[in-house]
Amino acid sequence: MKILIAIIIFSAIILFHEFGHFLFAKLNGISVTEFSLGMGPRLWSFQKGETRYSLKLLPLGGSCAMVGEDTAEEEIPGSFNAASVWGRISVVAAGPIFNFILAFVLAVIIVGFVGYDPAEVLEVDKNSAAAEAGLQNGDIITEYDGYHVDLAKDLYVYMYLNDLKEGDTVTLKVRRDGRTETISYTPDVSVRYLLGFNRSDASSMTVESLIDGMPLQEAGLQPGDTITAINGVEIADGEAYDAYLAEHPLSSESVEITYDRDGLDYTATITPKEYRTPQLGFSYNLGYTKTSGLRILKYGALEIKYMIRTTLLSLKELVTGQLGFQNLSGPVGVVDAIGTTYEESKSEGTLMLWMNMLNMAVLLSANLGVMNLLPLPALDGGRLVFLIIEAIRKKPINREIEGRIHFAGLMALMVLMVVVMYNDILKIF
């Protein structure tokens, strides 16, 4: 069921994108030879007028094939190149624009049912640097270190992608009683001492994984080892471990760890590693607030703005190397993500299940719109670059040269899709 729903959502987004191309091709007198959902061999099709409408085997894409779209011919009546340059620009741009329109409509539905998430300060820690700087409960954060904040999720994503370092100064703009206040402070630093391991579950003391460069790994412990004592005090389970640390917090002093491996006891003397973390000194809203009237449209638009900004920020992180290639997902990964969200949302009730599905559709549709507008050969954005140059020059770039560039881009895109799909499959299985 989850796979079917995921495929339907993904296919609907692709179909709406291609419908944008199709509609504006018709409006500009360009003949469409085939409008299809999916890739590969046809499963079913029918002919109406000049256009064949097809459903194909692989539900991983779609197409709107126009006469003369990939040729240098201009004389063919009804061909893509026979249309005016602004007509062709509208046809190419319509796909991504329709994705943004679809995302906006779905976002408005979500906001209408669920509401929006204001970046409201819920609680300021007493005696913290934030409290001393004047931050108050109920303040609405509108800017964080120069980054404009419309919604709480804006704040969350920005802080996730931009680690706060010790000594950094945080500058907030907040809305309070109808006026804007500016608050600057240097966050306090929390000091903890860590051993550097993850347990298989909260009740167990079996080491599931070790953190690179941390004390337990450097002492030679391995996944599967079970910690049985600390400084001679028996640790029977996770609860006993938590109780021990509550009474004897780790510090810079060495501790003696006893652990079991394959039925044999071993002992290691370990110095916990200091871990310093800047603390913002406040918590903020992650829930939703109901709204009505035109504000639904406003916050629907802000949801789309958030999705577009997040996509662009993620692309920036990929280019700068802060996100790895393994973070990319293709159609297989997208379908799996939708399916996983579907399964995890079942326990939240029918309304939230479908709101989460719509939210995934908003994210994917906005993401597809942004990605297609990238100025890369074979993508809509790459075609728009050539068309805009043609509009400025009053004459087209050599069609054969343009065709070769787009073909090379298409080949590179297909190779990337295969690699990303392989990566998706590895992550799933």
Feature names for model-found ranges:
Residues 89-122, 157-161, 165-211, 217, ...:
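PDZ/PDZ-like peptide-tail recognition elements
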Residues 79-83, 194-218, 226, 233-234, ...:
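Functional transmembrane alpha-helices
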Residues 49, 60, 137-140, 166, ...:
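Short, flexible surface segments
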Residues 58-126, 408:
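Internal alpha-helical transmembrane segments
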Residues 2-75, 371-393:
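Small-residue-rich helix-interface/hinge motifs
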Residues 10-14, 65, 99, 103, ...:
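Alpha-helical transmembrane segments of multi-pass membrane proteins
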Residues 131-153, 216-240, 304:
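Conserved PDZ fold ligand-binding element
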Residues 28-29, 33, 114-132, 136:
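Alpha-helical transmembrane signal-anchor/signal-peptide segments
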